[in-house]
């Protein structure tokens, strides 16, 4: 059986992330990881904060902190939010770790030995006002391709084109805002991607048919435009230093590796961080080195937003290929479009949009987890609106699932006491229901296996709806007047549906799923996946099992709540 290695694109260290960041990489990876674990697979889910480069230095400067101290605090703050969202990382590391430094420097040495790194003198932007060379992200200006006036010197976030700072129109310093910029000569290391173009093309060709269209089209676009040699070092104070044993002159000048060189390597570095915590029982290399062979090969799935696709499908594979060592390369790239806020961008400065820490202040994580996955921007951009969020939570979670659980358990307790009633043997309605549930479960599983999250959410919702339809058809509140045994059967069947829901809903809404399972006094709280036979029989909770009525799973969002959220976070543009 394959082992599953799963990574999310590393969140930048420079602040708490918004809902778009959450649904674009971390949340779907967590949903998929949870599902695979429930199915009995060996799963390793790795993520980390991306701590090097311009964002870290700028954010630390704004806070008046040394950059290492800022990163330590920001890492802990992000980790607390992700814990609140119940993201079940096996390990959440830091790209500033010693492990990442060692592996990044190893990669650089190997690339150099194999003839894929070259030292070049280049002309780079220098700011007299700041007294320093300005790395890519320190330069802002207008994109020459799309005209976006807040493009950075490394990439335009509007059109996703990769840039050099000298490409920008009307460039300015991101530190001081000064437009008095000069171009001076400095030396840097270049990764000779042009020499690896053919190998990367062959590698992409072997995988792109399996990838979603979004990922494969971006990778192919980059390859068609040709891979260019790119500088992989920067003039920064914070980063993985260039090793002095290989490049003594550059090391003496304080050069560090470009953040997009060391950040993907941190997937490996974080795995070693995890392994080093328990080296007798964890083997990081078995997940990354020569991991395609043996009885339990690794299948590697990456999750990211579309702006990260070029780096993961072209640049990092080129690095791995050039090292000439059997490092594991990605098998499946799950890419996402943008989640917008009323059709526009999330903005911290303009106080527009919901950031993850604030989201947890007003509502439990399961509300957000379900809505975001059910509306994940898979085939196109999707828009968050408070009206849509409220309607989804109230209809799907409060009415369809939460109300079903409360109605069944409350009514059964009132009429039959605090144990699951026995009632009559299963009849035609129960047989029909079991077949319907098994079919819907198979559909749900199919979508989860192929990482189609919106479709999986729709199938999960259909499972919940099937229970409501069964309850309305049988109407135990009427049935009990003339056929108490039949009413008991209906409630016993419905309680088994609740337990089934608690298992299959676990990837989406883990806290609520646990609350549903905890309602039944079973021997253990098991979330082991439901088989087709178990789905058909609906008898995992036997008659006589004690149960309790849990607190309301999902409180409805009122009109007053809706207006207060829009006032706090901003609503539709006027």
Curated annotation (Swiss-Prot):
It catalyses: tRNA(Met) + L-methionine + ATP = L-methionyl-tRNA(Met) + AMP + diphosphate. One of its GO terms (molecular function) is metal ion binding. Binds 1 zinc ion per subunit. Its EC number is 6.1.1.10. It is found in: Cytoplasm. ATP binds at residue 348. GO terms for cellular component: aminoacyl-tRNA synthetase multienzyme complex; cytosol. SUPFAM superfamilies: Anticodon-binding domain of a subclass of class I aminoacyl-tRNA synthetases (SSF47323), Methionyl-tRNA synthetase (MetRS), Zn-domain (SSF57770), Nucleotidylyl transferase (SSF52374). GO terms for biological process: methionyl-tRNA aminoacylation. Zn(2+) binds at residues 143, 146, 156, 159. Pfam families: Anticodon_3, tRNA-synt_1g. A motif ('KMSKS' region) lies at residues 345-349. The keyword tRNA processing does not apply. It is an enzyme of class 6 (ligase). A motif ('HIGH' region) lies at residues 11-21. Its cofactor is Zn(2+). Gene3D superfamilies: HUPs, Isoleucyl-tRNA Synthetase, Domain 1, Methionyl-tRNA synthetase, Zn-domain. Keywords: Aminoacyl-tRNA synthetase, ATP-binding, Cytoplasm, Ligase, Metal-binding, Nucleotide-binding, Protein biosynthesis, Zinc. Belongs to the class-I aminoacyl-tRNA synthetase family. MetG type 1 subfamily. Is required not only for elongation of protein synthesis but also for the initiation of all mRNA translation through initiator tRNA(fMet) aminoacylation. Monomer. This is Methionine--tRNA ligase. It comes from Streptomyces avermitilis (strain ATCC 31267 / DSM 46492 / JCM 5070 / NBRC 14893 / NCIMB 12804 / NRRL 8165 / MA-4680). The lineage of its organism: Bacteria, Bacillati, Actinomycetota, Actinomycetes, Kitasatosporales.
């Amino acid at each position: 059986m394959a082992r599953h290695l799963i990574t999310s694109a590393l969140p930048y260290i420079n602040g708490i992330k918004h809902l778009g960041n959450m649904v674009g990489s971390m949340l779907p990876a967590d949903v998929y990881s949870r599902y695979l674990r429930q199915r009995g697979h060996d799963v390793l889910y790795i993520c980390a904060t991306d701590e090097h480069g311009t964002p870290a230095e700028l954010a630390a400067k704004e806070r008046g902190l040394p950059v290492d101290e800022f990163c330590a605090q920001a890492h802990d703050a992000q980790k607390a939010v992700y814990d609140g969202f119940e993201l079940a990382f096996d390990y959440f590391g830091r790209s500033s770790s010693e492990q990442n430094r060692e592996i990044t420097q190893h990669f650089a040495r190997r690339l150099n030995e194999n003839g894929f790194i070259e030292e070049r003198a280049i002309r780079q932007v220098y700011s007299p006002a700041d007294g320093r060379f300005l790395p890519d992200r320190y330069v802002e200006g207008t994109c020459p391709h799309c005209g976006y006036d807040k493009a950075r010197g490394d990439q335009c976030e509007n059109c996703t084109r990769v840039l050099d700072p000298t490409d920008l129109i009307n460039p300015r310093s991101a530190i001081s805002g000064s437009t008095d910029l000069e171009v001076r000569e400095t030396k840097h290391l270049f990764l000779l991607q042009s020499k690896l173009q053919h190998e990367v093309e062959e590698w992409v060709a072997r995988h792109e048919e399996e990838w979603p269209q979004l990922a494969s089209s971006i990778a192919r676009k980059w390859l068609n435009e040709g891979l260019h040699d790119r500088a992989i070092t920067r003039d920064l104070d914070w980063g993985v230093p260039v090793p002095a044993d290989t490049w003594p002159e550059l090391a003496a000048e304080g050069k560090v590796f470009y953040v997009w060189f060391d950040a993907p390597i941190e997937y490996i570095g974080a795995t070693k961080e995890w392994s080093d915590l328990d080296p007798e029982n964890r083997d990081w290399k078995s997940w990354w080195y020569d991991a395609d062979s043996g009885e339990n090969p690794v299948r590697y799935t990456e999750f990211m937003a579309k702006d990260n696709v070029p780096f993961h499908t072209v640049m990092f594979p080129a690095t791995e290929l050039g090292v000439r060592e059997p490092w594991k390369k990605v098998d499946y790239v799950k890419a996402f479009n943008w989640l917008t806020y009323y059709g526009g961008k999330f903005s911290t400065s303009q106080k527009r949009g919901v950031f993850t820490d604030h989201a947890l202040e007003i509502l439990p994580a399961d509300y957000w987890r379900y809505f975001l996955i059910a509306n994940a921007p898979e085939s196109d951009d999707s828009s968050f609106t408070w009206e849509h969020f409220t309607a989804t939570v109230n209809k799907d979670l409060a009415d369809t699932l939460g109300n079903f659980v409360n109605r069944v358990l409350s009514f059964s307790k009132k009429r039959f006491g605090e144990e699951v009633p026995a009632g009559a043997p299963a009849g035609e309605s129960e047989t029909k229901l079991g077949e319907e549930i098994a079919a819907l479960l198979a559909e749900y599983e199919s979508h989860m296996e192929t990482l189609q999250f919106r479709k999986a959410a729709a199938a999960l919702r259909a499972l919940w709806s099937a229970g409501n339809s069964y309850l309305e058809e049988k109407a135990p509140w009427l049935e009990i007047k003339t056929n108490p045994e039949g009413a008991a059967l209906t409630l016993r069947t419905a309680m088994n549906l609740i337990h089934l829901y608690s298992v299959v809903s676990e990837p989406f809404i883990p806290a609520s799923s646990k609350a549903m399972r905890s309602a039944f006094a079973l021997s253990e709280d098991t979330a082991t996946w439901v088989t087709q036979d178990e789905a058909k029989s609906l008898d995992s909770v036997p008659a006589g099992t004690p149960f309790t009525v849990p607190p309301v799973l999902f409180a409805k969002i009122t009109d007053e709540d809706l207006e207060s959220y829009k006032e706090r976070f901003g609503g539709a543009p006027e």
